[in-house]
Amino acid sequence: MRASMFVLDQTVRYVAIIKRYKDGRKYYVVPGGKVEVHENIQQAAIREIAEELGLAIEQSDIFDSIIEKGNVFYFAKTNYSCLPLKIQGEEKERSHPHNSYEPMWLEWKQLSKLMVFPKYDYLQFEEIVSEIL
């Protein structure tokens, strides 16, 4: 099981995402990772966001979730206003010119046009985000 999280800024216009370049391919990744033995799925998602992006997410920030093919995607609305993101943790250590990680705030409506992993149902994503606008 993989724990991922869509982190939305305070305007609910932008989402934190990681642009990847690997072996000449460009794609995007929803921040997240594996669930460790001592934690539940939600704790794993919160930890991964802290490790990868340096963002502090509270349980109270999380307002919904969906499950897609062995992946749990949490949705968190934050008080962040698109502050600069820096890749951290294992991803920073593994980063080099042929395998790079570039965290960014992206207008969430653009996600439908991009190759994003892990795969998720964009229409369901849009419905969930639209409910809090």
Task: Please state what every model-predicted region is.
Residues 35-117:
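Unchanged
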Residues 1-30, 57, 61:
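N-terminal strand-loop-strand
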Residues 14, 21, 27-28, 74, ...:
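Sequence-level detector for tyrosine residue identity
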Residues 15-16, 47, 85, 130:
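Residue-level marker of intrinsically disordered, low-complexity segments enriched
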Residues 23, 27, 89-92, 103, ...:
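A generic structural signal for ordered alpha-helices
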Residues 113-133:
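Charged phosphate-binding loop/patch that engages nucleotide di/tri-phosphates or the phosphate backbone
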